[in-house]
Amino acid sequence: MLTIKDIENFKETFNDETPLGEPQHWIYLKSGRSLEITHEENGIPESKQYFSIRLHCSEEEFNNGDYYKTCGVITTLTATTAQDTLNCINAIMRTFKEMED
């Protein structure tokens, strides 16, 4: 799982990037779902940049049409600090009873 230090150093520790070049990290969960953490920065002044944390449904849930209208996104939270980002990740994991794969 990500630590505060990982989030603070996101440019070095995140394992992917968006098509817009924004740092992104994926956490794959035992349920088949995934957690996407993106540093939203493209076209945003540095003082207003933030992290988005999205829980994506599993392939099976998507194929069943469960989250088709939301493009597979179950929930989204946003945060501006590393601590708030970690709190959002933990809140999603607790609320949806998820475990890292």
Residue ranges of model-derived segments:
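Intrinsic disorder/low-complexity segments
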Residues: 12, 32, 42, 94-97
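Mixed-charge, Lys/Arg-enriched low-complexity segments
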Residues: 58-101
